[in-house]
């Protein structure tokens, strides 16, 4: 087999292969982009992958209305422009959007609460696809349900488009705290926890035995500064998604480079001090506490 064929096999196929491709992004930063020019900036700044969508989450909030999958021709343009993986967002439960993204060549599909939910009851059956999926979660039970459906990567939901990292921290702490509790439980107690929380029993035991999720777990939702990115890595995340925080900043190139540097040096305060001096003014934020319940995106798709 050629090197190209080996990479293609890693990108698509079995559950193990899909998880392997997702794991290749570990330790990196994935940046939201709306066009090929932004994708080039993200790649030059050190992103390990880009996530294409029609508008960044902060603009989706401002615009209102129905947020849908972006034009797949734009995704194809970005694939031609950059050498890093290109991901695309589909609405929760919208199988057809995910099929289109896969056909367009998306390296990974994000079944995303940032877009308007298409199905109030069911998520996409991600096992039916060859492209890997990433899904958001606020707690361990949500994460394990998404993995059971075939997700190859989990991310915190946070509260996208706000520039407020509070909810991303809360969701990551929720997941870590529950894993710690499971580790200290007897086998029968884990079974009871699975029943009480509506989580797949098999995955509950696997998570407890591993001491972590069975798939990579990234931070997302409200990450707007290098310090935010470092904080989430310190909380045990495997990598970072940054949405509005890059191209909503005064200098996207500098902000992108600084976020990548912060992830690479998250446990070195001296390095972080220097990194924090460079990026310029960040995006204008909105505190989570100021959002009405109907304005919150994180409750979509439990």
From Swiss-Prot:
CDD domains in alphabetical order: pdxS (cd04727)
Primary gene name: pdxS
Residues reported in the UniProt entry to bind D-ribose 5-phosphate: 32, 161, 222, 243-244
Bilayer-crossing regions: none
Quaternary structure annotation from Swiss-Prot or TrEMBL: In the presence of PdxT, forms a dodecamer of heterodimers.
One Pfam family of this chain: SOR_SNZ
Alphabetized UniProt keyword annotations: Lyase, Pyridoxal phosphate, Schiff base
EC annotation from Swiss-Prot or TrEMBL: 4.3.3.6
Protein name: Pyridoxal 5'-phosphate synthase subunit PdxS
Pathway involvement of the protein, from the record: Cofactor biosynthesis; pyridoxal 5'-phosphate biosynthesis
Binding site for D-glyceraldehyde 3-phosphate: 173
């Amino acid at each position: 087999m050629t090197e190209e064929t080996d990479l293609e096999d890693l990108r698509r196929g079995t559950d193990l292969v899909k998880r392997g491709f997702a794991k290749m992004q570990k330790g990196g930063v994935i940046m939201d982009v709306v066009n090929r020019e932004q994708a080039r900036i993200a790649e030059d700044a050190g992103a390990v992958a880009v996530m294409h969508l029609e508008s960044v989450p902060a603009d989706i909030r401002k615009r209102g209305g129905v947020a849908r999958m972006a034009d797949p021709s734009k995704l194809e343009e970005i694939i031609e422009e950059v050498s890093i993986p290109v991901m695309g967002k589909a609405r929760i439960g919208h199988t057809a959007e995910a099929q289109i993204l896969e056909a367009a060549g998306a390296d990974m599909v994000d079944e995303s609460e940032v877009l308007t939910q298409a199905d109030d009851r069911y998520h996409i059956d991600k096992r039916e696809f060859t492209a890997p999926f990433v899904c958001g979660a606020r707690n361990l039970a949500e994460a394990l349900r998404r993995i059971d459906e075939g997700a190859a990567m989990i991310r915190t939901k946070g509260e996208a488009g706000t520039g407020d990292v509070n909810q991303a921290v809360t969701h990551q702490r929720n997941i870590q705290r529950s894993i710690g509790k499971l580790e200290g439980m007897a086998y029968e107690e884990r079974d009871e926890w699975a029943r009480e929380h509506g989580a797949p029993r098999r995955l509950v035991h696997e998570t407890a035995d591993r001491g972590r999720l069975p798939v990579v777990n990234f931070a997302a939702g409200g990450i707007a500064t290098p310090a935010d990115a470092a904080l989430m890595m310190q909380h045990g995340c495997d990598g970072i998604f940054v949405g509005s925080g890059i191209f909503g900043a005064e200098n996207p190139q500098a902000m992108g480079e600084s976020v990548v540097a912060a992830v690479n040096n998250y446990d070195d305060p001296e390095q972080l001090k220097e990194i924090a001096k460079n990026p310029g003014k960040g995006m204008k934020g909105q505190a989570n506490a100021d959002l009405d319940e109907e304005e919150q995106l994180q409750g979509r798709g439990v």
